[in-house]
Amino acid sequence: MEEFVIPVFSERDIPYSLLNHYPLAIQIDVKVDDEGGKHNLIKIPESDMIDVPRLSIIEALNYRPKRNDGVVVPRLLDITLRAYDNRKSAKNAKGVEFMTDTKWMKWAIDDKMDIQPLKVTLDNHCSVNHQLFNCIVKARSANADTIYYDYYPLENGAKRCNHTNLDLLRSLTTTEMFHILQGAAYALKTTYELVAHSERENMSESYQVGTQRWIQLRKGTKIGYRGQPYERFISSLVQVIIKGKIPDEIRTEIAELNRIKDEWKNAAYDRTEIRALELCKILSAIGRKMLDVQEEPKDEMALSTRFQFKLDEKFIRTDQEHVNIFKVGGSATDDGRFYALIAIAGTDTQQGRVWRTNPYPCLRGALIAAECELGDVYFTLRQTYKWSLRPEYGQRERPLEDNKYVFARLNLFDTNLAVGDEIIHWRYEVYQPKETTHDDGYICVSQKGDDELLCEVDEDRYKEMFDRMIQGGWDQERFKLHNILTEPNLLTIDFEKDAYLGARSELVFPPYYDKWINSPMFNARLKIARGEIATWKADDPWSNRAVHGYIKTSAESLEYALGPYYDLRLQLFGDTLSLGQRQSAVFEHMAQQDDFSTLTDYTKGRTVCPHSGGTFYTFRKVALIILSNYERLDPSLHEGREHETYMHPAVNDVFRRHVLEMKDFSQLICFVFDYIFEKHVQLRNAKEARRIIYLIQNTSGAYRLDVLREAFPNFLKHVMNLRDVKRICDLNVINFFPLLFLVQDNISYWHRQWSIPMILFDQVIRLIPVEVGAYANRFGLKSFFNFIRFHPGDSKKRQDADDTHKEFGSICFEYYTTTKISQGEIDVPVVTSKLDTLKLHVASLCAGLADSLVYTLPVAHPKKSIVLIIVGDDKLEPQIRSEQIVNKYYYSRRHISGVVSICVNQGGQLKVHSMGITRHRICDKSILKYKCKVVLVRMPGHVFGNDELMTKLLNV
């Protein structure tokens, strides 16, 4: 058979029962009406297409597909054809058989981050219905196994869009490299009502017990976020009473809790009225809303289950603590007892005091909910309900129950504070580049200015850790950078815990308040001081909310190593699905940068596309920064050029032409090693680079060394030198390892608080623990980039290594040849299904969407090949769509012998294009009294394969 017939019909003109014997049919009387000439993307959730929800883009990127009629990997056939081509013959008892490289095929399938969760229907004729905006494509079930959707966000000429390589956008979003950074701030808790109780003239006076004194305020004055009452309070001149208050953000959730509380009270405190799972969900919602509404989802299952058990336990009337709480009289109330029991359950789950910065939303939600009723929770538990932290939870936190903690961490992206409201916020100043020579290099020098504090490595603590290192090797679970730093320790200080109202109602600030903390090892100095809100809350995250605050683009954020001092927000906002919406102003800010036009196809000042402007600029800028810093870590000497000067850190423009060709992070990683160690300037293709990085990360021991030997033989020679370090330059190679193990768009760390060893090129060279995913869950490049900026000069590199340096080499060789830190489990349904989500969102920011469906037809004779049948809308010309889809067959393009591209407009009219061995005609067909159109596809001299040929190809 060399002809293939595709009916194009309307049920009004001909029943499908007369056409259901055809493998493929196009029904044109079911469509989604366009709005203003664009597809109405808002209709996708109610249509039988793919499972993309009608949520904000950030919620959608964390969405777990719910309706699962099957999933499809669009490039599965491309992968299996390549595996078929590369089969090798092997002899066995049955003779010669061809063996498929199943390991490669599994990797290639798993590596594809474009899985489509389908929403399809099966009709009474055993056909699978795939809906497009302009029609429905009906396929017989035997022919449906390779059908997939192809969505393409249309390009806006005014923006000079280029929507190729949207995979790169997905990579940036999953590696925290498409995010805006904004400084951290604190303000008075919105769950507290602070009421003035007395005043004093100055801080040397004490508040008089039993009497009230008024100087500038009146009795009952409430302390807000500005004005004289706030000024007097922040100056520690007002004694206050703390009452609970319900903030507007969580009023609905607190109402739900109060409903449960009232039912519990009315049922005589019957535990069956307490549904722990329901409580836990409400408390989690509170915890998210009050800290970061767009917080990355965490795996709370184990902790949440433990919390639910504790809730059940505390609400049993025979529980001893339940009995004690109900024995207390005085100012105790049943409402207070309800929230006290929740707070105690949360404390027992945490096995210690719960703070607002607790990483688990359900626990911090328990604290916040209790604050709304009790005021300062632990102070009230002790004073009113006679409950204290258990001794087994440690003695350090029990004295804190005498204090009242009135400040809470703010997320400036989310806070509703008004312009002019007072806050306390961090200022974060990164060091400026400085001039140096090849002989001197750029090392960490601990120094501070007048009136500055200093955070550096504590020699005694470091020596203690080093002794443990010598005895037991690298302990990735217990070695922590924060354990070896001096005070004020930038990795442990927390203003929320360090500022409080003391036992005498005096406002106590920490010693570091309003002082610069200098930390050369983090290339920065920081200060927390008073400030105020500068702008109103906006949907667009590119809004510097604080006077003298800081906000940075993703390309600038690499320099900010200390995660607790800022928040991140994806620089996409708004709805996932929309007919049209505005994009973030951050892209216009990028377009104003001096290097924007050299890294993109734009001239300065034009309106830019978030992808061809934002994605490409961000990736290329970051790539230049990474390459330029790693170039300085080259172990080689600069013979004859020792006294040449250069600025550091600074971008080396020699890498620009290579960066412009890169399409994937893996190419960047491989190029670092190829350029510095292998002396190659040729860029590896993205598929090869991704495979190399995968193999390095997922092998260990001798197998990992074999991969390195094949991919980067000269680098391996330097690695082998770690077993017997001779000179300081031999240590440089250690700081290249994190690039191989910590950066990829589809990996997860085994644990987000484990530490890897890196060299800190200080005046004394040290091996320090760098926690992956630590410092507020920063991961990827941000977790280690700060430390690769330091590099020894030639004078240091020539020095002989001492016994300590030799130990560094041995420890790191053992660790990095065996570590499996990058082999954690990813959340496959969430992570792998987001490429189409991003495509649909980009479509709403640019010129709308073009949609199509791809069907594969096998050819059996005279030469085995495939023909692609594409059915789509008229937003793209059929020949352009053909070229776009064929180009996605990276491995097996030579097997595509023909393409037929059918375009259907909103009125059901057709436009068809064929290429290769295929020819087409549009004909009229009559069956009895019914009529329809058919697209007659001919392949002169060729024979189509049977239905199961595709099944065989997909199971090579």
UniProtKB/Swiss-Prot annotation:
Principal place of residence: virion
Cellular compartment(s): Virion
Cellular component terms (Gene Ontology): viral inner capsid
One GO BP: virion attachment to host cell
Domain of life: Viruses
Keyword Nucleotide-binding among UniProt keywords: no
The entry's keywords: Capsid protein, Clathrin-mediated endocytosis of virus by host, Host-virus interaction, Inner capsid protein, Viral attachment to host cell, Viral penetration into host cytoplasm, Virion, Virus endocytosis by host, Virus entry into host cell
GO molecular function list: structural molecule activity
InterPro entries assigned to the protein according to its UniProt record, in alphabetical order: Capsid_VP2_Orbivir
Pfam families from the UniProt entry: Orbi_VP2
Protein purpose: The VP2 protein is one of the two proteins (with VP5) which constitute the virus particle outer capsid. It is the major target of the host immunogenic response. Responsible for viral attachment to target host cell, probably by binding to sialic acid. This attachment induces virion internalization predominantly through clathrin-dependent endocytosis.
Family stated for the protein in its record: Belongs to the orbivirus VP2 family.
Protein's recorded name: Outer capsid protein VP2
Organism of provenance: Bluetongue virus 10 (isolate USA) (BTV 10)
Species classification: Viruses, Riboviria, Orthornavirae, Duplornaviricota, Resentoviricetes
Gene behind the chain: Segment-2
